[in-house]
């Protein structure tokens, strides 16, 4: 049924639950998996303190935790006997959800499988909702996998 499954990953428990569901789908359908981790490289106060002559390029800032999250996801796929294509994206200005939508369109994904924290109310308002953005702006079917209660 699905040939190309896009899976946003961030290293969180809900993200891992989404990945495990995507692995099941991929195994059943012999589908390709693309793992996408988006780094939002907001310029920190330290970067501003470096001054106007600074050579710091915030668009290239990733850290070991970002790379490790993607590698852990890739390892989980491999442990389940499948292959995946990891993609690390970086943004300063774009909404993380928008990059996921764009990636799904560019890759011609058949479905996006996404773990969600299931936050609502004030929490969602403060934290934003990548899941909601993806749902509202993609033309691709989306499967949300909720985290465990309390996560």
PLM segments and residue spans:
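Short, flexible loop segments at boundaries between secondary-structure elements
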Residues: 142-151
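A short acidic, glycine-rich active-site loop
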Residues: 53-68
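Glycine-rich, Arg-bearing micro-motifs that act as flexible, cationic patches
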Residues: 111-133, 151
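Short, hinge-like loop/turn segments at secondary-structure boundaries
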Residues: 50-54, 103-105, 130-131
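Structural beta-alpha unit
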Residues: 75-112, 150-151
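Small/aliphatic-rich secondary-structure junction motif
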Residues: 3-55, 76-85
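Short, well-ordered secondary-structure micro-motifs
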Residues: 18, 45-48, 97-99, 124-126
């Amino acid at each position: 049924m699905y040939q190309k499954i896009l899976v946003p990953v961030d290293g969180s428990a809900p993200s891992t639950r989404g990945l495990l569901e995507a692995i099941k789908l991929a195994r059943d359908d012999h589908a390709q998996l693309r793992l996408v981790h988006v780094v939002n490289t907001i310029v920190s106060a330290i970067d501003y303190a470096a001054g106007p002559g600074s050579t710091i390029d915030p668009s290239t800032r990733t850290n070991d935790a970002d790379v490790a999250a993607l590698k852990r996801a890739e390892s989980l796929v491999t442990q389940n006997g499948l292959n995946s294509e990891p993609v690390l994206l970086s943004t300063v200005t774009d909404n993380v959800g928008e990059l996921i939508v764009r990636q799904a369109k560019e890759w011609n994904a058949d479905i996006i499988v996404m773990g969600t924290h299931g936050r609502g109310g004030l929490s969602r308002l403060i934290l934003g909702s990548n899941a909601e953005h993806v749902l509202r702006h993609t033309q691709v079917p989306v499967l949300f996998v909720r985290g465990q209660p309390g996560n």
